[in-house]
Amino acid sequence: MSYRVRFTRQAEKDIKRLSPKLRDKLKAIVRNRLAVEPYSGKALLGSLKGYYSVRLSFQDRIVYSIHDNELLVLVLRARTHYGG
C-alpha cells in the first residue's frame, strides 16, 4: 500500500530554495520513505502535534501530515527550523 505525496505551496517554495543535492535527497526520501512508511518519521509535539518530521540535512527538515483515509502524505515545509 503506497501513499500519494502532495506539497503545499509553501513546501514548493522551500524546495526551490534547496541546493540541487538536497532536492535529490528530498526526492529519494519522498519516494522511498514517505510514500511507503510515512509513520517512520518523528512525531512532533506541542503546537505541531499531529505532524511528523524527517531530517533532510543537519538543519533542514521535511514536515508533513498523514491522511490515512485518503492514503495521502501532505508535505507542509521542507526547510530549516533554525530561523529560516
Task: Place the predicted regions along the sequence by residue.
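Compact soluble domain cores
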Residues: R23-R33
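Enriched for short, Lys/Arg-rich terminal
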Residues: S2-K13, R17, K21-D24, V54-R61, ...
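A short, surface-exposed loop/turn module that caps and links secondary-structure elements
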Residues: R31-L56
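N-terminal functional modules and adjacent low-complexity/disordered segments of proteins
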Residues: I29, A43, N69-L71
